[in-house]
Amino acid sequence: MRVSKYLLSTQKETPANAEVISHQLMLRAGMIRRNASGLYTWLPSGLRVLRKVEAIVREEMNKTGAIEILMPLVQPADLWVETGRWDKFGPELLRFQDRNNRDFVLGPTHEEVITDLVRKELSSYKQLPLTLYQVQTKFRDEVRPRFGVMRAREFLMKDAYSFHLDQETMDNTYHAMHTAYSNILTRMGLSFRPVLADTGSIGGSMSHEFHVLANSGEDLIAYSTGSDYAANIEKAESPMPTHTLAAPTEAMTLVDTPNAKTIAELVEQFNVVITKTVKTLIVKGATDEVPLVALVIRGDHELNEIKADKLELVASPFEFASETEIRAAVGAGPGSIGPVGLTMPIIVDHSVTVMSDFAAGANAEDKHYFGINWDRDLPLATAADIRNVVEGEPTPDGLGTYAMARGIEVGHIFQLGTSYSKSMNATVLDENGKAQVLLMGCYGVGVSRIVAAAIEQNNDDRGITWPEAIAPFTVGILPMNMHKSHRVADIAEKLYQDLADAGVEVLMDDRKERPGVMFADMELIGLPHVVVIGDRNIDAGVFEYKNRRTGEKQDIPFDEIVAFLTNAAKG
């Protein structure tokens, strides 16, 4: 492709409303343009990357034996009513009526449509297991679209759904999808981690997220330094204490703490060791009989709301009690709450069960107890894992310690069980002629999100540094002053044609532009391999080659350049 015949709409300045580097670079490199909040047009360079990502995803799906279909973006509301999600889904579900006043939605996901299809098309166990997938546009009316295509309202996604009668084939398909997702991201040249994830409101028995590692990632991943274990911070298991409860060495004393509303203030003003303090958090209870529950964690730890949400006594969805509710129940504000004397159920983190001589709120305004000890001052409460793990703690497999990394979720696989098939009566006859509800798996990849995530991981101060497999073009040719030099023009044209004939995707900048502009644009769009042609190089019989990712430069003889670049393009 010649730039003179191409739409290369680069921008020098960073757009003011672009918060993250991928959004900035996609706009500056002429990959996307904003139409409205969360809606984007993909320009030629962006679309080339998107299609390459899509092709790799499709190839790996086909290898698993999954069969491609295409479902409609517009879905009838009746299906959503059937599963109960018509009422459960919030305003992110865009609803509208056709001219006959029938309700429809723009699909944010396709579980209802695929389950409806399968219950009509499948009748026998002989047709199972079956995996169907599509690459389709989705729409979610996000309250605040941000980060460009990272969190857009309209996005491209691959979603696959598998159907089974037994757990064994479900597990086999799940494992195949796990492998396929790893292959997808490996082929794209991205650093990533599959992590154990919470199944959330969807439910099911197993869930993994696939995260592209990037410092700008919104998700915190806890992984083992000595094994493949990794989990989303909400799912990572905290280790059990390795020491036992020590005997008391202090008497419990009531202390006035008028200016200590937080653990940090208590530690600073009273010279207390933070690991000798606890935080008591009051949350909504699951029943009218138990309206409030106290959760107690060590002062330097953070409550894990996902773990707390799963506790039998705690309301789901998880919700903190209001200050009014706390004062009515305890007689003090949130900064003065502690476990001593509380009449509501108390659940403590495992780490708190081995604490002695610790400090906590006294359930009286501006007062704390110091020197609290279990059994002596209050009965040992029910214990559970309710906190986030901390870097350096042992991982549950015993093979390493926790380290932390930031990640961008680009894929998610679930074992759904019968969540949708049961509510929609999706059954087939088993070998005994008895109707059985189908087991389902769900496997999603954010195709357009991968593009942004790849840029978040692969960039420098000059622009994008594309991995080979998903770059818009493999080679960029920069002929210096070709409109003034016939030699440069002739050799550039020959190299361009030779590379095209060899199947290499090449972009030649044949514009009448200053060299500085040409170099800046080529580095901005991030093509992996750049060849510079000038009169001085021609005199020496070499091309100047630069690797965009490593910055390495070398001179390549004329007769070796095509073979060199062809091999480089193969990675």
UniProtKB/Swiss-Prot annotation:
It comes from the Bacteria. This is Proline--tRNA ligase. Its EC number is 6.1.1.15. Keywords: Aminoacyl-tRNA synthetase, ATP-binding, Cytoplasm, Ligase, Nucleotide-binding, Protein biosynthesis. One of its GO terms (molecular function) is aminoacyl-tRNA deacylase activity. Belongs to the class-II aminoacyl-tRNA synthetase family. ProS type 1 subfamily. Consists of three domains: the N-terminal catalytic domain, the editing domain and the C-terminal anticodon-binding domain. The lineage of its organism: Bacteria, Pseudomonadati, Pseudomonadota, Gammaproteobacteria, Alteromonadales. Catalyzes the attachment of proline to tRNA(Pro) in a two-step reaction: proline is first activated by ATP to form Pro-AMP and then transferred to the acceptor end of tRNA(Pro). As ProRS can inadvertently accommodate and process non-cognate amino acids such as alanine and cysteine, to avoid such errors it has two additional distinct editing activities against alanine. One activity is designated as 'pretransfer' editing and involves the tRNA(Pro)-independent hydrolysis of activated Ala-AMP. Homodimer. It holds the Pfam family HGTP_anticodon. It comes from Shewanella frigidimarina (strain NCIMB 400). One of its GO terms (biological process) is prolyl-tRNA aminoacylation. Its main location: cytoplasm. It catalyses: tRNA(Pro) + L-proline + ATP = L-prolyl-tRNA(Pro) + AMP + diphosphate. PROSITE patterns: AA_TRNA_LIGASE_II (PS50862). SUPFAM superfamilies: Class II aaRS ABD-related, Class II aaRS and biotin synthetases, YbaK/ProRS associated domain. It is an enzyme of class 6 (ligase). The keyword Protease does not apply. The keyword Ligase applies. NCBIfam families: PRK09194.1 (NF006625), proS_fam_II (TIGR00409). It is found in: Cytoplasm. One of its GO terms (cellular component) is cytosol.
